[in-house]
UniProtKB/Swiss-Prot annotation:
Name used for this protein in its record: Neutral ceramidase 2
UniProt KW Oxidoreductase keyword: no
Function: Hydrolyzes the sphingolipid ceramide into sphingosine and free fatty acid.
Presence of the UniProt keyword Protease in the record: no
Gene name of the record: NCER2
Enzyme Commission number(s) of this protein: 3.5.1.23
Glycosylation: residue positions: N311, N348, N657
Family: Belongs to the neutral ceramidase family.
Gene Ontology, cellular component aspect: endoplasmic reticulum; extracellular region; Golgi apparatus; membrane; plasmodesma
Catalysed reactions listed for this entry: an N-acylsphing-4-enine + H2O = sphing-4-enine + a fatty acid
Organism in which the protein naturally occurs: Arabidopsis thaliana (Mouse-ear cress)
Principal location listed in the UniProt entry: secreted
Compartments (UniProt record): Secreted; Endoplasmic reticulum; Golgi apparatus
Keyword vocabulary terms for this entry: Endoplasmic reticulum, Glycoprotein, Golgi apparatus, Hydrolase, Lipid metabolism, Secreted, Signal, Sphingolipid metabolism
InterPro entries: Ceramidase_alk, NCDase_C_sf, NEUT/ALK_ceramidase_C, NEUT/ALK_ceramidase_N
Length: 757
């Protein structure tokens, strides 16, 4: 029977419609926004070192987000922060803003906010006392920039939602992390350890996002290694190895994926905009000699944004390197050594002649922490590029999510009994052990504490009791942890530690993300992943199979320190001593995640659970504000204090320095802008920005001549990259000064020109 042409066209239309829905079943959007924050005076979050005060920028911090949505159904949001961890109060305020914008579209259920665990970002943005002691309390600038950056990254992702596909790939990266507590890991059952080749997880899982018309738009990956390539004495804001990897990959993609990824040629996307000058050195020097340093002068506040290299108006490729179960994983891969003798540290306690302060891990670039950051970042970047280029497994299936708040200070947990059967035990109010104060080999503590201490000592117990003496029930519950700080029961001036924690599952087809509010150790993460994967497969083998990918997103939605296995907890190294809720903490997580998984499989709605507190109105800040900025008589803000040498020539790999009279960076955070720019002279006599303070090759360093001085200076260091084009360059500084009456004025100044050959 003949088919009429209109009917044939209608059938063809339906087939094409079905095909398009099959090929591009998701809407996908990505976004990215600056969260660098105050680059001066603020204590850095991570090492709890009160002397580690920000004084410049290594490269900028960002919030990177993706949204994956069913066209007429569920959607999930994942935000990766170049920050030490997520914060409960940040999450609360972000969700409030999203509700004001979008109603119930984005809520605590389907939004995950995760930190990469850099130890080189401004602190003071968490709400619990324990985590803001060294930052002199709450720092409003740190908090505001993170909240705003997360919101803006999600807004960008929402506004860029378009039909697309997501692909997943995974592979092993072997040399970017080592176990920093191997004696603790060895306390896990031998039969369990025998299932794994390594004592840390080596697998990176990457998701590649592809727009149906525009092509690749981003990638997010999860891999476990600590953000501690930068040391506890570093004072420059840095995304550490994961932030560096993200910068490298975004530049690699924006540069057309053509640049080599060798260690000598970190990808740059901007060199192609510079005209290739003659290689005649004398001619270039003659040109450079005509451009002397400029006097400091007032500029429009937005000029630093307009002249930055990575223009915010352009569609971005967003690449995020997310954290996983990194609890006992160090990027300092050369091992741990005593700084006085050079000998390896004690295996069980990580001490040197009984002192923890002398035992440090060495990164692959030792003794250069910036080089270690580059190497570990580059390793992750190269692995991600390989997975990105070979990603062919398409994510297909439902979008789903589950979320619950739980009171971990008093949770009933069912555990097996030694003689068979089971019994119900409880988690404990939060407490930290003596081993916590010893620190780790990435950042040792002080005094006479040591890891692996399950006894404590009389003197420090007396000191502890001044704050709070733990009761007998708490002591029994936390055993064998000797309690140093009973933080869960300390409530003055407000809560010292969290009790109510969020747990969350996000599903994108065969990818399942377990959002956890802390740092799982390697084996703890393996147990959780394996338990939930097995549970999902057994619950619905048609919907879930062995081909599913389960990843842990660490430090997500809030922060509650560490989660060690029962056996690791017994050893009481740093990770066990920092497992707040007692020896059954991991079992509690597995139990409660199974409840989320049950709800995910059956499409159930779980009770919301007890609400975490909003302590914003109770916060105390002791950080003094900027009072006034000044310069010596006859000097303007932005004037050059120390210029580049006259008629100077630099080769690739050499460093160029210029120092300017400046104001405090807290006056203007230069969000989505830059304090420092390297400009090149283009044909026609126009200067074009080619590097800024978001580049790995450039460092912005700020200092005062004395602690209470109102004068300050900014030194900009540029190590000429291998990819730099020969030509005439200069260094420009942007800043802001505060008058005695409180007004803020923006300024700029530039160095004399110099030649790169």
């Amino acid at each position: 029977m003949a088919v009429s042409l209109p009917l044939f066209q209608f059938i063809l239309f339906l087939l094409l419609l079905l095909l398009s829905r099959t090929v591009y079943a998701y809407l996908i959007g990505v976004g990215s926004y600056d969260i660098t924050g105050p680059a001066a005076d603020v204590n850095m979050m991570g090492y709890a070192n009160s002397d580690q005060i920000a004084s410049g920028i290594h490269f900028r911090l960002r919030a990177r987000a993706f949204i994956v949505a069913e066209p007429q159904g569920n959607r999930v949001v994942f935000v990766n922060l170049d920050a030490c961890m997520a914060s409960q109060i940040v999450t609360i305020k972000v969700l409030e803003r999203l509700k004001a914008r979008y109603g119930e579209l984005y809520t605590e259920k389907n939004v995950a906010i995760s930190g990469i665990h850099t130890h080189a970002g401004p602190g003071g943005y968490l709400q619990y006392v324990t985590y803001i002691v060294t930052s002199l309390g709450f720092v409003r600038q740190s908090f505001d920039v993170v909240v705003n950056g997360i919101e803006q990254s999600i807004v960008q992702a929402h506004e860029s939602l378009r039909p697309g596909s997501a692909f997943v790939n995974k592979g092993d990266l072997l040399d970017a992390g080592v176990n920093r507590s191997p004696s603790s890991y060895l306390n896990n059952p031998a039969a369990e350890r025998s299932k794994y080749k390594y004592d840390v997880d080596k697998e990176m899982t990457l998701v590649k996002f592809v727009d149906s018309q525009l092509g690749p738009t981003g990638s997010f990956n999860w891999f476990a290694t600590h953000g501690t390539s930068m040391s506890r004495t570093n004072s420059l804001i840095s995304g550490d190895n994961k932030g560096a990897a993200a910068r490298f990959m975004e530049d690699w993609f924006e540069n057309g994926q053509k640049n080599s990824v060798s260690s000598r040629n970190i990808p740059r996307r901007v060199s192609t905009i510079v005209s290739d000058f003659s290689r005649n050195r004398d001619r270039l020097l003659d040109i450079a000699a005509t451009y002397k340093s400029s006097r400091g002068h007032s500029v429009d506040k937005s000029l630093d944004v307009k002249t930055r290299v990575r223009n915010g108006s352009k569609r971005k490729f967003v690449s995020a390197f997310c954290q996983s179960n990194c609890g006992d994983v160090s990027p300092n891969t050369l091992g741990t050594f005593c700084i006085d003798t050079g000998l390896p540290c004690d295996f069980n306690h990580s001490t040197c002649n009984g002192q923890n302060e002398l035992c440090y891990g060495r990164g692959p670039g030792y003794p250069d922490e910036f080089e270690s950051t580059r190497i570990i970042g580059e390793k992750q970047f190269k692995m991600a590029v390989e997975l990105f280029n070979k990603a062919t497994e398409k994510l297909q299936g439902k979008i789903g999510y589950q979320h619950a708040y739980l009171d971990f200070s008093n949770l009933d947990v069912t555990v097996p009994k030694a003689g068979g059967g089971s019994e119900t035990v409880k988690t404990c109010p939060a407490a930290m052990g003596f081993g916590f104060a010893a620190g780790t080999t990435d950042g040792p503590g002080a005094f006479d504490f040591k890891q692996g201490d399950d006894q404590g000592n009389v003197f420090w117990r007396l000191v502890r009791n001044v704050l709070r003496t733990p009761g007998p029930e708490q002591v029994q519950c936390q055993k064998p942890k000797p309690i140093l700080l009973d933080t869960g029961e300390m409530k003055e001036p407000y809560d010292w530690a969290p009790s109510i924690l969020p747990i969350q599952i996000l599903r994108i087809g065969q990818l399942v993300i377990l959002s956890v509010p802390g740092e799982f150790t390697t084996m703890a993460g393996r147990r959780l992943r394996d338990a939930i994967k097995s549970f999902l497969i057994s619950s619905d083998p048609k919907e879930f199979s062995n081909n599913m990918h389960v990843v842990i997103a660490g430090l997500t939605n809030t922060y509650s320190q560490y989660i060690a296995t029962f056996e690791e907890y017994e050893v009481q190294r740093y990770e066990g001593a920092s497992t707040l809720y007692g020896r059954h903490t991991l079992t509690a997580y597995i139990q409660e995640f199974k409840k989320l998984a049950t709800a995910l499989v059956n499409g159930l709605t779980l009770p919301r659970g007890p609400q975490p507190p909003d302590l914003l109105d109770k916060q105390i800040s002791l950080l003094s504000p900027v009072v006034v900025d000044s310069t010596p008589l006859g000097v303007k803000f932005g004037d050059v204090k120390a210029d580049v040498p006259p008629k100077s020539t630099f080769r690739r790999g050499q460093q160029v320095n210029a120092t300017f009279w400046s104001g405090c960076p807290r006056n203007d955070l230069m969000t989505e802008g830059s304090f420092a720019v390297v400009e090149t002279l283009r044909e026609g006599g126009k200067w074009a920005p080619v590097y800024d303070d978001d580049d790995f090759s450039l460092k912005f360093k700020w200092s005062r001549p004395a602690k209470l001085s109102s004068e300050s200076q900014a030194t900009i260091e540029w190590r000429v990259p291998e990819s730099a084009v020969a030509g005439v360059y200069r260094i420009r500084h942007y800043g802001a000064s505060k008058s005695l009456f409180g007004s803020i004025s923006s300024f700029s100044g530039s160095s004399s020109a110099f030649v790169v050959v």
